Amino acid sequence: MALTSNVIGDIGEMEVSTRLMETGLFIVFLLGGKVPAFDLLAEIVPDTNAQEKPYQFLIQVKSTDDANPFTQADHRLKTPVLNDKLNALIDRPLPSYIAGVDLNTSEVYLVPAFDRGAGYGGSIPDTFRLVKGNRAANTALLQLLKNDVIDYWRGLDIDVYKPSFHSAL
């Protein structure tokens, strides 16, 4: 029996959540409903010794169970992200990423979603890969992701701005 697209998506979200949380660097919140621009909200588990904050980021998950999930020419995962979805994700003020999932191998491919011209309409690159059962290799990539999220938030100087914000309420 073939899986429905909703089930394929749900399985993909679980795979991404597992890969992100397996090293203890992140916690992932499953939203439990359809959000137009993203599927997961993730948060850094702060290292209190490094005075880190629980900075958050968004993830749009695209999954496939296709027997041939990669393009032949350049080996990109055939999990297209339509421009309207990409733009909606980029419009959110949090750092945002796309995770493509090959359900045949449970491998997760991460790409940044900051650039409207990224070109994920037909497929996504396989450069940043999280492999099931390869925690050592995954840790290095997840540390890059963590640093990326921290750099984003620190670049906004949110730690200075928020305490000085004057609410109208």
Pin down the residues of each PLM region.
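Mixed-charge (Asp/Glu-Lys/Arg
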Residues: 1-36, 41-169
